[in-house]
Amino acid sequence: MQQKNKYIRIQEFLKQNKFPDFRMNQIKNAVFQGRINHFNEITVLPKSLRKLLIEEFGESILNIAPLKVQHSEQVTKVLFEISGDEKIETVNMKYKAGWESFCISSQCGCHFGCKFCATGDIGLKRNLTSDEMTDQILYFHLKGHSIDSISFMGMGEALANVQVFDALHVLTNPELFALSPRRLSISTIGIIPGIKKITQDYPQVNLTFSLHSPFNEQRSKLMPINERYPLLEVMDTLDEHIRVTSRKVYIAYIMLPGVNDSIDHANEVVNLLRSRYKRGNLFHVNIIRYNPTVSSPMRFEEVNEKQVVNFYKKLKSAGINVTVRSQFGIDIDAACGQLYGNYQKNKNQ
């Protein structure tokens, strides 16, 4: 059974105790306009109500606890403790233009076992609740950060957790975080039912598909989910998403040295995408340099920059929209595929 988010529970609590509707509005305004975290500091509420709220929900609105904060150039990574003594990580990236982007986790661990990912190596501990996902953003909001964009690209597979859709509702609710759906991004390894639900319920949310190999057999070895949802079936689902939404789909491609960075791979990516451009030039490849991890199932060599450039040029010359993604936070294990791996390794020693 899906757990109701805290904002619904607070509203129901107020109604059950016969408080007027405007009290909920006062709480929302205190949190999202005044950046107030503790019920006792919402002084527009009667003291008696504050006492009842604390007894029912605890002292603070935020229900996850920051344990460790690490800083690197343009990047902050926070390790949070959630219920059950489990841990998750969130990354804040600050761009030189002033834009702030947040990479949040949707699961504690991940059971899909992609061979290049530290998070997948620890297995799935549990799905996060809607509150645990949105609280990662609330933490930064309460500290005065500008919430410019959010990616569900942290720990876990977002579309394997049904609570993600309630989190999207909370984040886009005009009375709560009030974010435009176009400032939100969902990354998936290819969970077809989840992609279809995004198409139907959140067509303006950005969608990223983790490809990492255009060859079906190799992709199955790197990403076992390909056995359940084969590449071409996923691509057909993405075609339908584009047809319905007229929105761009991003293709993430991690360059694994000596594994998937050859010109043959580049040519096959071109073949995979170019035939689909009849619906518009709406696939965009993001090339991601492999980030070394302490505990991924397979080890890979350092990225060959020449191969990255050659791969990029091959796609570009074929008319494919392509970008080489900038790297942030590698030194604090905050980059793609690194989250939680180093903490888990240290914990087990």
From Swiss-Prot:
Organism: Bacillus velezensis (strain DSM 23117 / BGSC 10A6 / LMG 26770 / FZB42) (Bacillus amyloliquefaciens subsp. plantarum)
Entry note: cofactor: Binds 1 [4Fe-4S] cluster. The cluster is coordinated with 3 cysteines and an exchangeable S-adenosyl-L-methionine.
Name of the molecule in the record: Ribosomal RNA large subunit methyltransferase Cfr
Named cofactor requirement(s): [4Fe-4S] cluster
InterPro entries attached to this UniProt entry: Aldolase_TIM (IPR013785), Methyltransferase_A (IPR040072), rRNA_lsu_MeTfrase_Cfr (IPR022881), rRNA_lsu_MTrfase_RlmN/Cfr (IPR004383), rSAM (IPR007197)
Gene Ontology annotations of biological process type: response to antibiotic; rRNA base methylation; tRNA methylation
Gene Ontology molecular function: 4 iron, 4 sulfur cluster binding; metal ion binding; rRNA (adenine) methyltransferase activity; rRNA binding
Domain of life where this protein originates: Bacteria
Miscellaneous: Reaction proceeds by a ping-pong mechanism involving intermediate methylation of a conserved cysteine residue.
Cellular component GO terms, alphabetical: cytoplasm
Disulfide bonds: C103-C336
Keywords attached to this entry: 4Fe-4S, Antibiotic resistance, Cytoplasm, Disulfide bond, Iron, Iron-sulfur, Metal-binding, Methyltransferase, rRNA processing, S-adenosyl-L-methionine, Transferase
CDD domains per the UniProt record, alphabetical: Radical_SAM
Active-site residues (renumbered): E89 (proton acceptor), C336 (s-methylcysteine intermediate)
Family assignment from sequence similarity: Belongs to the radical SAM superfamily. RlmN family. Cfr subfamily.
E.C. numbers: 2.1.1.224
Domain Radical SAM core: 96-331
Catalysed transformations (reactions): adenosine(2503) in 23S rRNA + 2 reduced [2Fe-2S]-[ferredoxin] + 2 S-adenosyl-L-methionine = 8-methyladenosine(2503) in 23S rRNA + 5'-deoxyadenosine + L-methionine + 2 oxidized [2Fe-2S]-[ferredoxin] + S-adenosyl-L-homocysteine
Binding-site residues, [4Fe-4S] cluster: C110, C114, C117
